Every structure is written in structure tokens, then in C-alpha cells.
Amino acid sequence: DDDQECQPGSLGEFIARSNKMFVGTTGYYNKPEATLELFSNGWIHTGDLGRMDEDGHFFFVDRKKQAIRRRGENISSFEVEAVIAAHDAVLETCVVGVPSELGEEEVKAVIVLKEGHKVSEEELIRWCEPRMAYFAIPRYIAIRDSLPKTPSERVEKFKLKQEGITEDCWDREEAGIQLQR
């Protein structure tokens, strides 16, 4: 957020600049505020978060707007989705941040199972435990028949985020599940 170079391994936003100002774009049509955010201090802010390794290779982590902030930790919805989607019973998933009573957000996973497969929410939590940081493991899980999608089949994350915690959400904390740290 401060246009400073990150250390290898740390999370940061991909930003770029050209030796010719505003090459390729003049900003967002009729959106002056969004254009100001895009072009800040001579840098183009992509809105993508990632890490650079020791060899200078870059790795995408998430869209800045879709990253989840939970108890002081930045969580990539993209990375949590990848772990959950690797489970044999899971067809697709979408992970969003929902409001927390402690401030910031809690992690909610909405999951569609493959036809003929069954898995409990606790089994999914136990699947996640050895594969991701404890703070990224979803607190809420909703198993559904489908995810909301655009005509081009992109998941409409904003709809799942807007709905918040719904009646079909299983709550890991209410279930008394203790995570291994």
C-alpha cells in the first residue's frame, strides 16, 4: 500500500510503471475515483496480490479485493479454494470473508460436492488442517447444490459475500472443533 518493494516471500500488490506515463490506458471510463486509485504515485496498481521468491519469480496469490483479513492475518481466498477443491468429494468451491463479531472477517467456504459424494463439514476441516495455516481454515461451511454464476460461468463471489452467514452455514466454533496449530 505504500509503493515500497517487498522482501522475498512477503505478500504485496503487483504494481508497474512505464518510462512513458499512461501508456496503453487513460483510466476507467467515467470513473475518476477508480482511475486515481489505479494510477498512484506514478505506478499502475493492478489490484493483484502476490509474492516474489528468492530467485525473482512472481506468484499470484489473490485479487486485493477478494483477500480476507482475519485477526490481523491476510488470507488468500484463492489459496483456500485450491486446498478445498483438491478434496476428492469437492466439485467446486468459493471462499469469501464474512463479518466477524471481533471485527475484520471470518472465512466462509461455499462448497458444491461431486454427484454421489458425501463429506461432512468436520471432514473438510480435517482435510484443510495439514494443508494450510490454521488461521485460514474456514470457520463457516455451506454445502450447496450450485454456486451463483454469470452467463460466462464465472462464480459471482460478491453475491456470496453479500449474503453473509446464512442458515445453511455450519459453524466450526459452535461445533467445538479445535484446530491444531
Across the structure, where does each feature detected by a protein language model lie?
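AMP-binding/adenylate-forming catalytic core of the ANL superfamily
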Residues: 5, 16-21, 26-27, 32-38, ...
